[in-house]
């Protein structure tokens, strides 16, 4: 037995903890309800390491083991690859393939151009991954743009599906799941209504993603859960003429088929893959976001991304109280504002898999309390600054939009 193994055993560390020495941890890539994701170097190159605090999943450890079990069974070009896992006394470490190309919507904002044909090819990649999961009776339950990542910065990079934290493997194809799961704006009506759900929830989420890809905004825009439920239950999906006049009929038909209120009326993943729109024959090559629409779409997407980044930053500040070794300083977190994302969902807002919140610091004595209060001030200051900056940006964007619209009207009348 090596000295390191002996020390780990004496300090109460699990046997697998010795694997941690194989990784050199770097920047923080994301933060969420249960932990953070950090970049790390190992002998085979760069990887992503999801670090989950055990105290945050106490009583729900099964959720972590289910994720590990799932990841080890998956092998698909459009699903992030599992590498390894290990644990310490107080954390789980899940090592996966590192996606450095950024989120799907980051790419749209960056290039400012996205054709219907691009959207068709993108959705086909995602649906291929979903179909692979559904054939194995696995429901992802948290499909959203933030969990769709490009592997590299190359223009022809593969898109991969990430974050299987609340995915479930069904005992049989007809099994009904009853726990709340998903993210606000993407969860299916049957999830929000607690009516029981299955594979069809992924199809609904994909419908929301497809709609958003084609116009830059969501088909359901309510800001609270009650109104969102009513909006989704109505079954009314509007294709506003101003933004949808150049989008093919096949694209709209595809979206409507996925956004059926009755889950039994939605196509299966296999059926959806056969839809004419995914063949790309009817999809247009014309840029979907020209002039005013491009500006509006980009500004909306950027605001959404900024909200996610703010949430990540705040969560990382909270996590600072938990562990100094694995969690970087607030300065490090802010410095990674423009960094690549990984598969840790920042907003599993509807999930009831684990009702625990981040516990307060357990530091003893006056100094511990002082540190806790100091971090709270940092968090409050960060929130205030970001809200003010977001408001200023929004005012400027509104002014610019009004200017562009005014000039467009003047050109139309000239």
UniProtKB/Swiss-Prot annotation:
GO terms for molecular function: ATP binding; calcium/calmodulin-dependent protein kinase activity; calmodulin binding; protein serine kinase activity. Its EC number is 2.7.11.17. The active site is at residue 142. The keyword Cell division applies. Autophosphorylated in a calcium/calmodulin-dependent manner. Residues 351-364 have a biased composition (Polar residues). One of its GO terms (cellular component) is cytoplasm. InterPro entries: Kinase-like_dom_sf (IPR011009), Prot_kinase_dom (IPR000719), Protein_kinase_ATP_BS (IPR017441), Ser/Thr_kinase_AS (IPR008271). One of its GO terms (biological process) is cell division. Keywords: ATP-binding, Calmodulin-binding, Cell cycle, Cell division, Kinase, Nucleotide-binding, Phosphoprotein, Serine/threonine-protein kinase, Transferase. It catalyses: L-seryl-[protein] + ATP = O-phospho-L-seryl-[protein] + ADP + H(+); L-threonyl-[protein] + ATP = O-phospho-L-threonyl-[protein] + ADP + H(+). Disruption phenotype: Spores arrest with a single nucleus and fail to extend a germ tube. Coiled coil: none annotated. Monomer. This is Calcium/calmodulin-dependent protein kinase cmkA. The lineage of its organism: Eukaryota, Fungi, Dikarya, Ascomycota, Pezizomycotina.
């Amino acid at each position: 037995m090596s000295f390191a193994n002996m020390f780990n055993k004496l300090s109460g560390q699990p046997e697998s903890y010795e694997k941690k020495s194989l990784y050199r941890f770097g920047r923080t890539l994301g933060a969420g309800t249960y932990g953070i994701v950090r970049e790390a170097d190992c002998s085979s190159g760069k990887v992503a390491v999801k670090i989950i605090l055990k105290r945050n999943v106490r009583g729900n450890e099964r959720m972590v083991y289910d994720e590990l079990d799932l990841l080890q069974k998956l092998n698909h070009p459009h699903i992030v690859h599992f590498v390894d896992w290990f644990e310490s006394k107080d954390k789980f470490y899940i090592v996966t393939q590192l996606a450095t190309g950024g989120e799907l919507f980051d790419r749209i904002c960056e290039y400012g151009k996205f054709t219907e044909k691009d959207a068709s090819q993108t959705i086909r990649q995602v649906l291929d991954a979903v179909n692979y999961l559904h054939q194995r009776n696995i429901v992802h339950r948290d499909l959203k743009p933030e969990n769709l990542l490009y592997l590299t910065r190359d223009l022809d990079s593969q898109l991969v599906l990430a974050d299987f934290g609340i995915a479930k493997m069904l005992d049989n194809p007809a099994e009904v799941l009853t726990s709340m799961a998903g993210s606000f704006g993407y969860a299916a009506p049957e999830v929000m209504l607690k009516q029981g759900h299955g594979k069809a929830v992924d199809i609904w989420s994909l419908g929301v993603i497809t709609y958003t890809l084609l116009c830059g905004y969501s088909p359901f825009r309510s800001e609270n859960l009650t109104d969102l439920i009513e909006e989704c239950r109505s079954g009314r999906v509007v294709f506003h003429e101003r933004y949808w006049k150049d989008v093919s009929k096949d694209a709209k038909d595809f979206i409507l088929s996925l956004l059926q209120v009755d889950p039994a009326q939605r196509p299966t993943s296999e059926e959806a893959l056969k839809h004419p729109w995914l063949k790309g024959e009817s999809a247009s090559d014309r840029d979907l976001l020209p002039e005013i629409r491009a500006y509006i779409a980009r500004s909306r997407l950027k605001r959404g991304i900024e909200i996610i980044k703010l949430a990540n930053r705040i969560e990382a500040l909270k996590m600072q109280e938990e562990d100094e070794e694995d969690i970087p300083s607030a300065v490090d977190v802010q410095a990674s504002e423009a960094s690549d994302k990984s598969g840790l969902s920042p907003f599993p807002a509807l999930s009831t898999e684990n009702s625990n919140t981040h516990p307060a610091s357990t530091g003893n004595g006056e100094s511990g309390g002082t540190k806790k209060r100091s971090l709270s001030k940092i968090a409050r200051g960060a929130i205030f600054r970001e809200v003010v900056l977001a408001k200023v940006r929004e005012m400027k964007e509104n002014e610019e939009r009004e200017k562009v619209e005014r000039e467009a009207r003047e050109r139309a009348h000239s």
